[in-house]
Amino acid sequence: MADKTTDTSPKGGFHTFLCVVDESEELSQALRFACRRAMSIDGNVALLYVVEPAEFQHFAAIGDLMREERRGEAEEMLQVVASSVQRQTGRTPIIYIREGGVTEALVSLLEEKGDIDSLVLGAATGPEGPGPLVTQIVQKMAGRLPVPITVVPGNLSDELIDALT
C-alpha cells in the first residue's frame, strides 16, 4: 500500500479536523464546517483521498496504469480542495493519499496518526441514506475510533454552518 503525506502545517498544539475528499455533493458542507471550526480555534484541516484499487487486475501493466491514472486524478482533486481550504483558513492543509478501501484506509490513518483530533463527514440527504461511508463509520465503527465524529448534513446552508461554527 502506498501512502503519501504532505505536512506543511504549523506544528504545535493545533486541533486538526480531517475531511475525506471524494466526489460527493456533501463534501462542500463538511469542508466548510471543518474550515470554520479550525479558524475559530486556530486549528488545522487535513484532507484524505483514498484511491480505490483498480477493478481490472488481469494484467499487471494495465492495473499499474489504471492506478497511476487514479492517483493523478486524486492529486488534481486534492489541489482544488486544498486551495479552497487555504482560502478559507489561511493555512495549507495536511494532505494524505492512501490506496485501498475507503473505510479501511480512514480507520488505519486515524489509528496511525495521533495528531488528528476530529473526523468531519458530510451526509447525503437523499432517500437512500447518508451515504456508505457515513453509514459504515457511524453504525459500525464509531465506538472504536480514536477521535470524535461530526456528521454535517449535506443540505445545510453556508450561513447556517457559519452560525454553528
Regions found by a protein language model. Name each.
Residues 4, 49-76, 159-165:
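Acidic, proline/glycine-rich short linear motifs
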Residues 1-8, 86-119, 163-165:
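Structural beta-alpha unit
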Residues 15, 116-118, 146:
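Conserved acidic residues
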Residues 41, 89, 137, 144-146:
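Short, structured coil segments at secondary-structure junctions
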Residues 46-48, 94-98, 150-152:
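General small-molecule cofactor/ligand-binding pocket signal
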